[in-house]
Amino acid sequence: MKIESPVFGSAEVSDDKVIEFPAGLPGFEHCKRFVLVHEEGSDTAVFLLQSVDDADVAFSITGPEQLGINYEFALSDEEVATLGLASPAEALVAVIVRKDGEAGSPASTGLRANFMAPLVINVEGRRGLQKVINRLGCDIVLRERA
């Protein structure tokens, strides 16, 4: 299938690369199918989660461990069933990240990560969800040391 990305332009993606988010993402419930896009030859740990349903919807994501963060949270039985997980090892956890400001590198302008609503993806089953953690909000800003 052919997708349009405002970041990478037109791209051909096989159907077996599509990740289904049955409930969509909060605020983007109409977007239920996504693909992970990565610039060829790039060694960055940030991927683009591009909606197949709406070309204007895309999120930069990375693994929390790439930011030096390790954390745990529990999934409900319903969430495990939605993902089709047989074991925790099948789950990939990612966080949505965004740059502060308009110019400069993420390290110099600040990189914000949403740790209170991680994405959980069953890589083999190609199903995902966004787990909203209902506790005090937390925003972590990473800045380059002077």
Curated annotation (Swiss-Prot):
Record GO biological process: bacterial-type flagellum assembly; regulation of translation
Pfam family, any one: FliW
UniProt superkingdom: Bacteria
GO cellular component terms listed in the entry, alphabetical order: cytoplasm
Localization annotation: Cytoplasm
Family, similarity comment: Belongs to the FliW family.
Complex and partners: Interacts with translational regulator CsrA and flagellin(s).
Function: Acts as an anti-CsrA protein, binds CsrA and prevents it from repressing translation of its target genes, one of which is flagellin. Binds to flagellin and participates in the assembly of the flagellum.
Name of this protein: Flagellar assembly factor FliW
Gene: fliW
